């Protein structure tokens, strides 16, 4: 007997976040790069799983709390009006917060992908590493509860 695992990070969390965000921001590229890769776009998102905690373990799976970082990058090119660009970026971040909170219990085909999804913090001035210096960024810290099921194959 073997236990089969699925990529529940992608299936339950990342795919849902991408679908929700692209429903509103359909032209914004979304990546899952670690470490950061300079993509050259004017504005893009980078979504990373930053923590995973087993909340409760069952014989058929585990209830897990997944922490996710969503960084919104805006490239700084030429003479920029910092306040105008920061205002645009902040509006995008607040709209993403609303989208996640409107979908706090997210289902696909009546199957729960996550429950109690929320944005716990927005950092409008996150620390940037050297590769990110040509960008203005803000970071949404999110948490989701999801069920990872174990499938036993004979």
Annotate each language-model stretch with its function.
Residues 41-52:
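A short, hydrophobic beta-strand-centered structural micro-motif
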Residues 1-36, 51-154:
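Charged, amphipathic alpha-helical segments and their flanking helix caps
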